[in-house]
């Protein structure tokens, strides 16, 4: 009687983890931008739950303000989680192309928003002027407002580039992420307000 032996080749087994640790600068870039996103989301939570004065003009459009706050809280939460996933082993559970594209998309969105604001400020000669935010709840120098978004954009790009290199993700996903940035920014700045007007939550 012939005994049939089955040999399991290494290619039939689950491959060992291919996760490689990020560069130190990439890890700290991801941690810094995740902290920024969570802290910034905290500002929206504060505005949503009592941070706006009773006589603030925002109270006149409070329904729209609530929707926009919830939207940006969600976006910032996703941004923080994405940044952490790019430098942690548990991030390997997510598709690498999705992480790379999301990191570059976040970088593109923030840098584009900062660049547009900076361009308008320079054109209007208002770079050093003070600007009111959130219905006057915050007053900061105009240049600081642009910098507030530019710096995390650079951090997202740094961590995203390192993740792309380590994971061997194709460059096309980074490009697609960057191309998607203007679409998401347009949806937040123009698409959502348009929908809120249709819903009667913002004046026409």
PLM segments and residue spans:
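Final/C-terminal transmembrane alpha-helix of multipass membrane proteins
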Residues: 174-196
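Cytoplasmic membrane-interface segments at the C-terminal ends of transmembrane helices
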Residues: 19-26, 84-99, 154-175
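Individual transmembrane alpha-helices with interfacial aromatic-anchor signatures
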Residues: 134-151, 173-180
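Hydrophobic cores of alpha-helical transmembrane segments in multi-pass inner/ER membrane proteins
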Residues: 2-3, 71-83, 142-159
């Amino acid at each position: 009687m012939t005994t049939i032996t089955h040999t399991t080749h290494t290619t039939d087994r689950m491959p060992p983890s291919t996760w490689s640790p990020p560069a130190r600068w990439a890890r700290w870039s991801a941690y810094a931008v995740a902290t920024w996103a969570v802290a910034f989301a905290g500002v929206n939570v504060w505005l949503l739950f009592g941070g706006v004065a009773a006589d603030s003009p925002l109270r006149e459009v409070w329904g729209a303000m609530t929707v926009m706050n919830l939207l940006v809280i969600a976006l910032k939460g996703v941004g923080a989680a994405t940044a952490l996933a790019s430098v942690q082993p548990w991030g390997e559970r997510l598709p690498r192309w999705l992480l790379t594209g999301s990191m570059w998309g976040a970088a593109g969105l923030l840098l584009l928003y900062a660049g547009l604001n900076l361009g308008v400020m320079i054109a209007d000669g208002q770079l050093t002027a003070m600007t009111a935010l959130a219905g006057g709840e915050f007053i900061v120098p105009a240049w600081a407002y642009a910098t507030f978004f530019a710096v995390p954009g650079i951090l997202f790009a740094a961590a995203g580039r390192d993740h792309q290199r380590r994971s061997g993700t194709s460059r096309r996903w980074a490009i697609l992420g960057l191309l998607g940035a203007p679409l998401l920014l347009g949806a937040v700045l123009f698409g959502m307000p348009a929908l809120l007007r249709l819903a009667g939550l913002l004046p026409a």
